[in-house]
Amino acid sequence: RTSRKREGEVRRVDPNASRRFDRVYWQSVAWIGHRVAVALQYAHDQRVLHRDIKPSNLLVDSQGEVSVADFGLAKSIDQAGISRTGDVVGSLRYMAPEQLAGAADTRSDVYSLGVTLYELVTLHPAYNESERAKSLIHGNAILPVRPSQIRHDIPSDLETIILKSINIEPERRYQSAEELATDLRRFCEDRPILARRTSPVERLW
């Protein structure tokens, strides 16, 4: 679903905020992620990649319905891998490493949604944009700190979902937006998630 209505736009919150969040907040973030993942799966089923998932492209109306906006950079899955290396398409801050190399696929959208969820739960950017630009250009992987190192009260299952979504190796991420949507829904329903928690060493490989 798309919309031009911007008043309900999901915005990044003050990174200096220090209040603790309750279970309702965490579940609200997870529910937003779930609805976006469902929308992405629909787009992927139509053979379309969004390629620019970020907070400003997620809209929430007065009824709590979530819409994915701005398909201006969307591309057919069948053509997404033929961009010339060096053609940066999307927002670097939310871009999967393989997307910069012109090798985007459905898991690249999963990655961008994961980075968006990271920022919504920590109220901090996942990456320093200038440092990340250098790392992507030179092929050096950098990892964001665990969300729980910034927000000590984040539920471990929600952190696990986010970290799996933003793994630098596409093969270690959720393999579809549907898989991500399933775990986010299970979290919202207080059911065990399917993803397992990864160690810091595993995140590097």
Descriptions of predicted regions:
Residues Q27, S83-G86, V145, A195:
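Residues at secondary-structure transition points
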Residues V66, Q79-V89:
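Regulatory activation segment
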Residues I53:
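Hydrophobic HxD+1 residue recognition
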Residues L49:
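Conserved catalytic-core element of eukaryotic-like protein kinases
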Residues R1-Q27, T85-G86:
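Intrinsically disordered, low-complexity regulatory tails flanking kinase catalytic domains
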Residues R19-A37, Q41:
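Conserved short alpha-helix within the protein kinase catalytic core
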Residues H34, L40-Q41, D45, S56-S62, ...:
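C-terminal lobe helix-coil module of Hanks-type protein kinase domains
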